[in-house]
Regions:
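Helix-to-loop junctions at the C-terminal end of transmembrane segments
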Residues: 41-54
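C-terminal ends and interior cores of transmembrane alpha-helices
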Residues: 64-79
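Cytoplasmic membrane-interface "Motif A"-like loop-to-helix N-cap segments
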Residues: 51-63
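Extracytoplasmic gate region of multi-pass secondary transporters
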Residues: 1-39, 136
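Hydrophobic core of transmembrane alpha-helices in multi-pass small-molecule transporters
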Residues: 83-99
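Interfacial helix-cap and linker-helix signal at transmembrane-aqueous boundaries
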Residues: 16-17, 48-50, 139-147
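Intracellular juxtamembrane helix-capping segments at the cytosolic ends
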Residues: 98-112
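Loop-to-transmembrane helix entry/capping segments in MFS-fold secondary transporters
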Residues: 24-25, 114-124
Length: 191
């Protein structure tokens, strides 16, 4: 998911304008719209449902729509229509507010013992940021050599892998205290 997020952060205005054929102002509106949707999704989906329903199911639904969102960009550019681009913005915005990033941070907080939590989170963030930077440098070369649709197919593959790993491997931690989770995972409290 972080490779997809890296693409969004570095290249979405370019993609909206050059692949989606939007004006610069509409491209910027799409980015702002996605941010607003992310904000709303964080409050109305993640904060309201994250502790009340199966997190695996919630993650599965949100991760699935994220794969669908990026799939739009694998279509030939002449097939893209405004409703598809708006759907991409809405689906990606929902994910960005209540999908992989939110669950990743939640699970990092829950699954690592307090004693090791900062180190573990720091290491995982370090690795993902390095990979995202490498991917960010690679995207223009991939687009130049193979075209944007190929890059989009890779992004869909990354989103699908993240979706499957999170959906299949999601821990059942909802409604449990950190102490309960720690004892379940390690057999005792980690001192």
């Amino acid at each position: 998911w972080n490779l997809c997020a890296s693409t969004w952060g570095f290249f979405m205005p370019y993609i909206f304008e050059n692949v989606g054929k939007l004006s610069n102002s509409v491209s910027q509106l799409m980015s702002v719209g996605s941010f607003v949707i992310s904000f709303l999704a964080t409050f109305f989906i993640f904060m309201q449902l994250g502790d009340r329903m199966s997190r695996r199911l919630l993650y599965g639904i949100i991760g699935g729509i994220y794969v669908i969102a990026w799939f739009v960009w694998t279509l030939p550019a002449d097939m893209l229509s405004m409703w598809m681009l708006v759907m991409f913005v809405v689906f990606a915005g929902i994910n960005n507010g209540s999908g992989q990033q939110a669950f990743y941070q939640l699970w990092c907080s829950e699954l690592f013992p307090t004693k090791y939590r900062a180190t573990a989170q720091g290491l995982t963030f370090f690795i993902t940021r390095i990979l995202a930077a490498i991917w960010g440098f690679s995207v223009p070369m991939i687009m130049e050599s193979f075209g944007f649709r190929y890059a989009a197919m890779l992004i869909v593959a990354f989103a699908a892998i993240s979706w499957l790993v999170g959906t299949i491997g999601a821990p059942k931690t909802e409604g449990k205290t950190l102490k309960q989770i720690e004892i379940e995972r390690y057999g005792h409290e980690v001192k």
